[in-house]
């Protein structure tokens, strides 16, 4: 029997930055090139990082660590995280971002506008690394730390940073110090952050989508909304709706396709392909309610995919089916959060044709079958 492979954990950009900082400061103090650095992660684990480089000249030292994302490589996997350390004229640890580290331009993030996108936990890890080395050598001096990521501006284009208003590079992130492979917690955290930015920038109406293609169609449907109002929720429909309500967002538009929204209509709020199968009996009942012929209802019941059902109903000109499906999605969403929101649902084909739309405002249904 084949044994299941254990996925290898990686380390966050914050952990890499802290390790590089410790090595650079040690080199600055001792005048010796370092080959590795050992730090304690926020979860309590002690880890030794090998250095990609270490050098010093005069009152400055630099060390670098290659980011290893483990078996869940993200856009920053393989990036060089560089720390340049020098003595500061004032006491304390002064942290800033250099080349390839983004700068915050919009409110709603854990870091104030104008500062380098180095999140609070990595900042604390860097401070702890500096203080540990200073204590080891009995020194009481101010230290300046600049974190940089060569090529970080290009890497950032593959992340949510431009949407979040983090310009010029990547963020230095991490709350636990490790990257758990395919962690749902990381994706949920990105949803919350995107919603917080939307709210902080005055968005009272957000559009949540199941993926990049759905988001493209959503932007065409709601061209008047700013970019930060559009949030990819992936499979986390229920979680995203609850976060919208928690943050006081009043209008939520859901945009997606037949496969996932056929599940949402039944109250399935985690719509991964493995989480719940499409219920073709439910879709057949909707088709019957929409006035489909008995032969078409039977065909729906025996279909292989929800997209196939959509094609069948579209070819038959049964637009009422899509109205009913969108209405069911709105009701399920409101039921999930206990009301208090206005919810719209739009369902699209893979090619970007809108099949139907419904809006539920405090218990009232409005339906718009076609067009924009």
Curated annotation (Swiss-Prot):
Single GO BP term: methylation
MF GO annotations: cobalt-precorrin-5B C1-methyltransferase activity
Pathway: Cofactor biosynthesis; adenosylcobalamin biosynthesis; cob(II)yrinate a,c-diamide from sirohydrochlorin (anaerobic route): step 6/10
Keywords from the UniProt entry: Cobalamin biosynthesis, Methyltransferase, S-adenosyl-L-methionine, Transferase
Pfam families xrefs: CbiD
Reactions that this protein is recorded to catalyse: Co-precorrin-5B + S-adenosyl-L-methionine = Co-precorrin-6A + S-adenosyl-L-homocysteine
E.C. no: 2.1.1.195
Cited HAMAP family: CbiD (MF_00787)
NCBIfam families: cbiD, PRK00075.1-1
Sequence similarity: Belongs to the CbiD family.
Name of the molecule in the record: Cobalt-precorrin-5B C(1)-methyltransferase
